[in-house]
Swiss-Prot record:
[4Fe-4S] cluster binds at residues 788, 1106, 1109, 1115. This is ATP-dependent helicase/deoxyribonuclease subunit B. The gene is addB. It is an enzyme of class 3 (hydrolase). Despite having conserved helicase domains, this subunit does not have helicase activity. Its EC number is 3.1.-.-. It comes from the Bacteria. Belongs to the helicase family. AddB/RexB type 1 subfamily. Gene3D superfamilies: 3.90.320.10, 6.10.140.1030, P-loop containing nucleotide triphosphate hydrolases. The heterodimer acts as both an ATP-dependent DNA helicase and an ATP-dependent, dual-direction single-stranded exonuclease. Recognizes the chi site generating a DNA molecule suitable for the initiation of homologous recombination. The AddB subunit has 5' -> 3' nuclease activity but not helicase activity. Binds 1 [4Fe-4S] cluster. Keywords: 4Fe-4S, ATP-binding, DNA damage, DNA repair, DNA-binding, Exonuclease, Helicase, Hydrolase, Iron, Iron-sulfur, Metal-binding, Nuclease, Nucleotide-binding. GO terms for molecular function: 4 iron, 4 sulfur cluster binding; 5'-3' exonuclease activity; ATP binding; double-stranded DNA binding; helicase activity; metal ion binding. The keyword Nucleotide-binding applies.
């Protein structure tokens, strides 16, 4: 018996030496048992390599094993596979059960026990303890040496409790993967299965105590054991230099020598493969220099420009992968490499793998991404989990529609979309899903409106869809009510899936993907279905006869599913391998691309301590309990990983890094890059931060049709913007144009480049269809046209509406309060009450009564059907009561009397519509509703003032009238004025146009403020805004109490009855204003009927018409495009506006 070390630096040929030794032994003694042990992930490659070296087409006489394969082989032969194997998901379920049962006994882990992810953390710790041969009772001796009140003592007691409970639940029931090597070593002790065999152990960077124990048993049995070690020298004073990159390897060597000597096993002369020129790098002096100098402090710089080593700095991750793909194509095209010779590795595979898959497909690079995909985002798993969440979250919107959008329910997507709109609009959740009665809530928010016929049909279809969804779900819930076993829940879920046809749909998907050649997806769906069934089995096994509610089962089930991942196998031999740096295999890799060589990524900086801190591990180590490395040691181990990675390729190494992440945050290059620059002062460095300018540089962008076409699009767009491009793009365009499969795309590209974000005029025939033969508009809608013609067209022409969400928006609040004030005003009018005689209590009672009546009439709307909105409506009573009382105060202080409420002008209204005749002969009718008309009859005529109720802040600006943004009140006044002129009725004189704000504002007051002072302050805060007739006597009639500044109207009278600073205009100015607005409306309607709907929003100071627009995704307004710019509007002094209007009025007349 003997132990031999085969050692050498990376690339020295250790694996090749093992394979040749096996060949020699096999030829010399064909009856001897030969065994090659390699890491689990390398067994297939090792078998291929051995077949290649042997040249026999098979390896019947040699076993290629991993330690786990050896465990299965031995236990299968000598016994030990008695109990079912438990999957990590089952382990996590057990740990969850233990935490649920014991968490009240914990002090250290009491809060952590309820934290998401703590189960996985404990599972990782238990795995570590088992791999390092630490049993629960191992902590007893440590605990004896710690004070009872010591923090670590409490922690170890709780870990021991959890660990011992975990083991007791496994014993005589399950076989844990983490125990297999321990069981293997015990079985090897009592058998001679590997007696007189020759064993080679290759490819390990380090060994766990479990593996060391197995190797010690093999050393006792085998004729010879050969272990490869990646190191410069075999033995050294490890303690003297922990920073030595090979320190861990040398420590392992000493450990094995000690074991061999303790069993009296001979130490055979070691095989040293270190030479000045290592075999792997025989074709590359640069890579040889890198291996020699990277870990050497007294390095020797390589002074020549590099050909085999390249550094690349990229703008972002996407372009980094693109440049990697181009270079792979170049290596295969120019240097004769095959895809199978190339490996792409990164320390952040999760952040790169999806983009690599997409970009490599564009470049026609076949690749195999060596990673496992979590199944929690798979449609089947998402459907089952969200189905359980429907009940644990009480039919929440999120859970219901996550379930429905899984695509496996069999319900049509259009039905789901309609249902979703309705549910969002009506805020449906909870018991409203399960109630027997049909849903009948109207999504329209209009007091006194009846249900529309089209809504009846829509509700009928929605209720059909709802029943299709809820009935099988309710049947499942009835089968699983109360406390049940895991078996009951799993059976219930399976029956539910079969009932709604999910099992058959999965089969159909698998068949469809198989027939279309999408084998990866077919395998994925098959795996996920099998995994789901496996989790059912694990849950039933682990939870046994224990009973619990649905919520607890859902938590256990989710924990079980989270441990499963989907794996795939390579589709062909000739493809690029993409994987994590930790798992790449050095054998036969000619070119290595390392992506994401950034600071904190590679080498890694995110090393968490876990449950046991570094200090805890140090205490345990001193007391004889060896565990995995602490963060300090792992940081040194990271240097060994860097060394192994950089020395992996035989011919070519390329390191790249992005300077920014997905969110644009700066990323720095790794310390590896600075080290490379020192060793190779003339290293080849490239970057895509500065765009290439010469044709020679552009050629590098041409690697494959799809990305080349994308680059062509970019080049032509830049040329379109006036940036000169190289001649090469003309040739590339000619090539694509000449290819049948690309010609249509070229035409589409040219059309796209010619595209300008300009809304073309709408055809007149379509305008007639949209607005009718006798169009009518409200003035507020025409103000929208002024704000942005295109937004007007989308909203009122095409009828696009924002998705209704269950809330009372400001317009809804305004509508409701308007309705209350309207009813109150009509009640006053119909009963001939006088506003001047009301008291506050009576107003409050009447408002409350009207609100209740409105709620009753709206019981089938959002407001009427919701307790929350009913409560909101009650709170609005206070606001409306304040508004009504304020109206009362205004009328009391004024000589004007209300003569009309909610007065319509339009067909069937109190006044006919305003008719605007266009130059084309077309007639446009303007309609509207005036909230309130006040009148004062005098000898020279009747003064009228228009009052418009606003639930939000609204100021009157003459410049806004000039720009067409505030035409409503002037038009209302003009409608009355015009009707008076035509009907030869009493003479109408404009008294004013005013905005009345409906609000109950907060005001500043002191402890000494009297109720009268508070009321006065509120009235000042809610003072009406608008434009009055510049007549001192008339203003006094509007506010009989005015002294100086009025507290109810925008006016001031100075001493001597002189009109002070006021928002006022003369009768002549009102006439000009009337004429100007009428002409403005005519011009606007003329443009509208011509179909002119340009994307032309305005900007005034910081406010733009895009600020609150819902249609920005439709118009795609973009200031970076020349044709897209704001119309700049500026506030002007009133005198300037009057001059401009007078000039226009003179021209028109």
């Amino acid at each position: 018996m003997g132990l031999q070390f085969i050692y050498g630096r990376a690339g020295s040929g250790k694996s090749f030496h093992c394979l040749n030794s096996i060949k020699t032994k096999q030829n010399k003694d064909s009856n001897k048992k030969l065994v090659l042990i390699v890491p689990e992930q390398y067994t297939l490659q090792a078998e291929r390599d051995l077949i290649k070296v042997l040249g026999t087409g098979g390896i019947l006489k040699t076993e290629v094993l991993s330690f786990r394969r050896m465990a299965y082989r031995v236990l299968n032969e000598v016994g030990g596979i008695t109990y079912p194997h438990i999957h990590p998901s089952g382990k996590n379920m057990i740990i969850y059960r233990i935490l649920e049962r014991l968490k009240d006994q914990f002090t250290i882990f009491h809060k952590s026990a309820n934290c998401k992810g703590f189960v996985n953390t404990l599972s990782t710790l238990i795995t570590e303890l088992k791999r390092y041969n630490v049993r629960a009772e191992s902590f007893d001796e440590v605990l004896q040496g710690l004070a009872d009140d010591n923090y670590l003592s409490h922690k170890l007691k709780e870990i021991k409790l959890i660990y011992s409970e975990f083991d007791s639940m496994l014993v005589d029931r399950y076989r844990d993967t983490d125990d297999e090597l321990t069981l293997l070593s015990s079985k090897l002790e009592g058998t001679e299965i590997y007696a007189k065999s020759e064993i080679w152990i290759d490819g390990f960077a380090g060994f766990t105590p479990q593996e060391v124990e197995v190797i010690s048993k093999l050393i006792q049995q085998a004729e010879n054991v050969h272990i490869t070690m990646c190191t410069d020298i075999l033995f050294d004073d490890v303690q003297a230099d922990l920073t030595d990159v090979f320190a861990a390897v040398k420590k392992s060597c000493k450990k094995f020598v000690s074991i061999a000597e303790s069993y009296g096993v001979k130490i055979l002369p070691p095989v040293c493969l270190n030479t000045p020129n290592l075999p792997r790098f025989k074709d590359s002096r640069e890579l040889q220099s890198l291996e020699t100098n990277y870990c050497s402090y007294s390095y020797r710089a390589y002074q020549l420009p590099t050909q085999d080593i390249e550094l690349f700095e990229s703008v972002n991750i996407y372009t980094e992968i693109e440049e990697c793909a181009r270079d792979i194509i170049k290596q295969c095209r120019d240097n004769g490499m095959q895809f199978k010779d190339i490996t792409v590795a990164t320390r952040n595979l999760t952040g790169y793998e999806n983009l690599i898959g997409v970009i490599f497909e564009q470049y026609n690079i076949p690749c195999f991404i060596d990673s496992k995909t979590e199944i929690t985002n798979h449609p089947l798993v998402r459907m089952v989990l969200s189905m359980l969440e429907i009940f644990t979250e009480n039919w929440s919107y999120e859970s219901v529609f996550r379930y429905l959008k899984s695509g496996l329910t069999g319900i049509d997507n259009t039905k789901i979309d309609i249902l979703e709109n309705y549910v969002l609009a009506c805020g449906i959740r909870g018991s409203r899903w399960t109630q027997e009665a049909d849903w009948n809530t109207s999504i329209e928010f209009r007091p006194d409106d009846g249900q529309k016929p089209e809504n009846d049909e829509m509700l009928l279809n929605i209720n059909k869809t709802r029943n299709e969804i809820r009935e099988p779900l309710i049947r499942f819930r009835n089968r699983t009510k109360g406390r049940r076993t895991a078996g009951d829940f799993c059976a219930g879920i399976y029956e539910y899936l079969v009932e709604i046809g999910v099992e058959q749909r999965i089969r159909n998907y698998i068949e469809k993907f198989t027939q279309s050649g999408q084998l990866r997806l077919a395998g994925e769906y098959q795996q996920v279905w099998n995994i789901l069934m496996d989790v059912f089995d694990q849950a039933v096994e682990v939870m046994a006869d224990e009973t619990f509610g649905l919520e607890k089962f859902a938590n256990v089930f989710k924990i079980g599913l989270a441990e499963y991942k989907i794996s795939s196998i390579p589709a062909s031999l000739d493809q690029v391998l993409v994987g994590s740096i930790e798992h790449i295999r050095s054998h036969e890799i000619k070119a290595l691309y390392i992506l994401g060589t950034n600071d904190g990524v590679f080498p890694s900086a995110g090393m968490s301590e876990g449950v046991l801190s570094d200090a805890d591990r140090e205490v345990l180590d001193k007391r004889g309990i060896e565990l995995a490395s602490d963060t300090k040691t792992r940081a040194f181990d990271e240097q060994y990983l860097i060394y192994r990675t950089l020395t992996t390729p035989k011919n070519y190494l390329r390191l790249s890094w992005p300077i920014a992440d997905h969110e644009g945050r700066t990323m720095r290059p790794s310390t590896i890059i600075s080290r490379m620059r020192k060793i190779f002062p003339k290293v080849t460095e490239k970057s895509n931060i500065v765009k290439p300018s010469a044709d020679k540089q552009h050629i590098d962008l041409i690697a494959s049709p799809i990305p080349a076409f994308n680059q062509l699009v970019c080049a032509l767009r830049q040329k379109n913007e006036g940036i000169e491009q190289g001649e090469i793009w003309r040739e590339i365009f000619a090539w694509f144009s000449g290819q049948d499969e690309w010609k249509q795309k070229c035409d589409a590209m040219i059309n796209a480049l010619k595209y300008r974000n300009i809304a073309a005029p709408v055809d007149k025939s379509k305008i007639r269809e949209l607005y009718g033969k006798s169009p009518y508009f409200t003035v507020s809608r025409l103000e929208k046209y002024t704000s942005c013609p295109f937004a007007f067209y989308v909203q009122y022409g095409l009828g696009a509406r924002e998705r209704k969400i269950y809330r009372m928006s400001p317009p809804d609040v305004g509508t409701f309060m308007h309705a209350v004030i309207e009813r109150f005003s009509k009640m006053v009018d119909e009963n001939n009450y006088s506003w001047r005689e009301f008291d506050r209590q009576w107003c409050s009672e009447q408002v409350s009564k009207i609100v209740d009546e409105l709620l009753d009439s709206m019981k089938n709307t959002i407001l009427g059907g919701s307790k929350r909105f009913k409560a909101l409506a009650v709170r609005l009573k206070r606001v409306v009561t304040r508004a009504v009382w304020l109206i009362t105060e205004h009328i009391r202080r004024s000589s004007f009397e209300p003569v009309g409420y909610e007065v319509d002008f339009g067909d069937g209204g109190a006044y006919p519509p305003m008719v605007i005749e266009l130059d084309s002969g077309e007639k446009i009718r303007l309609v509207g509703r005036i909230d309130r008309i006040d009148a004062l009859r005098a000898e020279n005529g009747t003064y009228l003032r228009i009052v418009d109720y606003k639930s939000g802040e609204k100021d009157f600006k003459l410049s806004d009238v000039y720009y067409g943004l505030q035409m409503q009140l002037i038009t209302y006044l003009d409608a009355l004025w015009e009707y008076s002129d035509k009907s030869n009725g009493e003479k109408i004189i404009p008294g004013g146009i005013l905005y009345f704000r409906i609000d109950d504002p907060m005001i500043r007051c002191t402890d000494n403020s009297t109720p009268e002072e508070i009321e006065t302050a509120i009235m000042k805060k809610l003072k009406m805004k608008g434009l009055l007739l510049a007549d001192v006597q008339l203003i006094k009639y509007m506010d009989n109490t005015i002294e100086g500044n009025s507290i109810i109207i925008p006016a001031r009278i100075n001493k001597g009855d002189v009109l002070g600073k006021s928002s006022a205009a003369t009768i002549e100015q009102f006439t000009v204003l009337r004429s100007y607005v009428k002409q403005l409306l005519k011009d606007m309607c003329s443009e509208l009927m011509k179909g002119n709907v340009p994307i032309s929003p305005y900007k005034k100071k910081k406010l733009t018409s895009c600020s609150y627009c819902n249609y920005s995704s439709v118009c795609q307004f973009d200031q970076s495009q020349k044709e897209n710019s704001f119309r700049m509007l500026h506030d002007r002094e009133d005198n300037d506006i009057w001059k401009l209007m007078n000039e226009i009025d003179v021209k028109d007349n």
